[in-house]
Design a protein with these regions (language model features):
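Alpha-helical segment of the N-proximal tetratricopeptide repeat
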Residues: 2-33, 43
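Residue-level detector of the short coil/turn that links helix A to helix B
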Residues: 18, 52, 86-88, 122
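Alpha-helical junction/boundary sensor with strong preference for TPR arrays
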Residues: 34, 68, 104, 137-138
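Alpha-helical adaptor scaffolds
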Residues: 39-50, 59-109, 116
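TPR/TPR-like alpha-solenoid helical repeat scaffolds
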Residues: 45-50, 79-85, 141-159
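TPR/TPR-like (Sel1-like) alpha-helical repeat modules
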Residues: 67, 119, 124-141
Length: 160
């Protein structure tokens, strides 16, 4: 039987090919006692996010935030999935991510996502400030993302 690392790499390969279902199937082949390892759980989360399975992704992301509090991307995933899961909301996503600004002050994606949430909640002045913060940290990346991001449409319309 191939080692867990083989299945993990195969799952990541399927994900790169855009096939979240095959990636999840590959992860199921990992020995049950190793499936709870953070690396396997993180790969599972990536699959769930790619497959837009928000109801499953949100609690897994929350668990990974607790297990690996130093990993900023788990908080970003948790907020993103919490917004989109059944019964989820922008407010929930905002409440998850806002405190992370202090913990990860150099992470521009936190400011960017908060700007999106604020904009969607029609808190445009705050969204503008948050986007400016993200721009200070990342500049061109933020400009490219913000130009097409539907979440920021009302902020762009206001600027025109």
């Amino acid at each position: 039987k191939p080692p867990a690392s083989h299945h993990l790499m195969a799952a990541l390969g399927w994900l790169e090919l855009g096939n979240a279902d095959e990636a999840l199937a590959e992860l199921e082949r990992i020995e049950p006692e190793l499936q709870s390892e953070p690396a396997a759980q993180a790969a599972r989360l990536e699959c769930l996010m790619a497959g837009k399975q928000w109801d499953e992704a949100a609690p897994l992301a929350e668990l990974l935030c607790e297990q690996c509090p130093e990993e900023v991307h788990f908080y970003l995933h948790f907020a993103y999935a919490a917004r989109r899961r059944t019964g989820g909301s922008l407010k929930q996503a905002y409440k998850i991510l806002a405190p992370m600004q202090e913990i990860f002050p150099d992470e521009w994606l936190i400011s960017y996502n908060l700007a999106c949430y604020l904009c969607q909640m029609n808190r445009l002045d705050e969204a503008d400030e948050m986007l400016a913060e993200a721009r200070k940290m990342s500049g061109e990346k933020v400009e490219q993302l913000a130009a097409d991001d539907e979440d920021l449409a009302s902020l762009r319309a206001r600027a025109d």
